[in-house]
Every structure is written in C-alpha cells, then in structure tokens.
C-alpha cells in the first residue's frame, strides 16, 4: 500500500500537471544561489581574476564552473538577477581563449555556439569573457584575465 506522501504526489501530478510538479520537486540550490532550468547559479561580488574565479567556482563542488550562457533567455534571467545587486561592474563568465588564438571555449565543456560579443570589444591580449554592465549584462567583452572582477558560477542539478 502506498504511503500518504506517494499518494499525494500522484494526485498532484494528475491535477497540476508535470510542469508544476517539476517546480515543486526541483532540487534545491546552495544557499544564496538561484535556480533556472536544471541549473544553479551563484553570483559572487568578490573581486577575483578570471582563473581564481574559476577555481573558486570549482571549489563549491557539484561540477561548478564559471557560468556558460547558452541562449538569450538564459542571458536575460542572469541579467535580471545581477542588476538586482549592481549595474556598473563587469562579471566574469566561463568563456575563455586558452590557446590565445581566438578559439573560445566554455570551462564546463559546453559546445553551444551562442555568442553575444559587444561589437566595440577589443580583442588583442584579451582572452577572458565578461558580461558587460553597459548593456545590462546582455553582451560580452573580451578582457585581460588578470583583472579582478565579480563572477558568476553555475552547476547542473
């Protein structure tokens, strides 16, 4: 005989539908992180260079890296979240050019080709990507990896 909890979940899934049930049952993110489409995001207002930001993201476990931004909707959700905290400082993301040949890669291994480069961004000797505050964090700049900035981490739930 099914427990009351199992019966309640079955009833909820039948009445509310799978979308509502998935929101109710979605895994929780670490305290201070936010959830969007099977991922948790942590925005950190600490100043770190790009490589130290990536190492700090990895230290949180769960396969966390500097965030990959894979489509316009995800970019919009992130933008709204960050602008709730600040509107002036760039934020590191996980896109970088490790061979310094303009062959950009995501630190989490994502292969999505979505890119939102600011058309005015300079590329010489700049091999790490940041979200641009002048465009509400919806476009990206190439910047020197040694600069110390805020950063955004992401992991899959």
From Swiss-Prot:
What keywords is this UniProt entry annotated with? Disulfide bond, Glycoprotein, Lectin, Secreted, Signal
| A single Gene Ontology CC term | cytoplasm
Highest taxon listed in the record's lineage: Eukaryota
Q: Which residues form the C-type lectin domain?
A: 36-154
Database matches in SUPFAM superfamilies: C-type lectin-like (SSF56436)
Under the heading InterPro entries, the entry gives: C-type_lectin-like, C-type_lectin-like/link_sf, C-type_lectin/snaclec_domain, CTDL_fold
Q: Which cysteines are joined by disulfide bonds?
A: 29-40, 57-153, 128-145
Descriptive protein name: Regenerating islet-derived protein 4
**One Pfam family, short name please?**
Lectin_C
Residues that coordinate or bind a carbohydrate = 97-102, 134-136
Query: Where are the glycosylation sites?
Result: 49, 62
What this protein is reported to do is described as: Calcium-independent lectin displaying mannose-binding specificity and able to maintain carbohydrate recognition activity in an acidic environment. May be involved in inflammatory and metaplastic responses of the gastrointestinal epithelium.
The secretion signal range is 1-22
GO biological-process terms attached to the record: response to bacterium
Question: Which subcellular locations apply to this protein?
Answer: Secreted
């Amino acid at each position: 005989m099914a427990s009351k909890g199992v019966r309640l979940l079955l009833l909820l899934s039948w009445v509310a539908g799978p979308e509502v049930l998935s929101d109710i049952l979605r895994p929780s993110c670490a305290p201070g992180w936010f959830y969007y489409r099977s991922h948790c995001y942590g925005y950190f207002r600490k100043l770190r260079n790009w490589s130290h930001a990536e190492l700090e993201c990895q230290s949180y476990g769960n396969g966390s890296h500097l965030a990959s931004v894979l489509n316009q909707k995800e970019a919009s959700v992130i933008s709204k979240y960050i602008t709730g905290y600040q509107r002036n400082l760039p934020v590191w993301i996980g896109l970088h050019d490790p061979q310094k040949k303009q062959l950009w890669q995501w630190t989490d291994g994502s292969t999505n080709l979505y890119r939102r480069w600011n058309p005015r961004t300079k590329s010489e000797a700049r091999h790490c990507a940041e979200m641009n505050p002048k465009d509400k964090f919806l476009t990206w700049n190439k910047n020197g990896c040694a600069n110390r900035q805020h950063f955004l981490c992401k992991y899959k739930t």
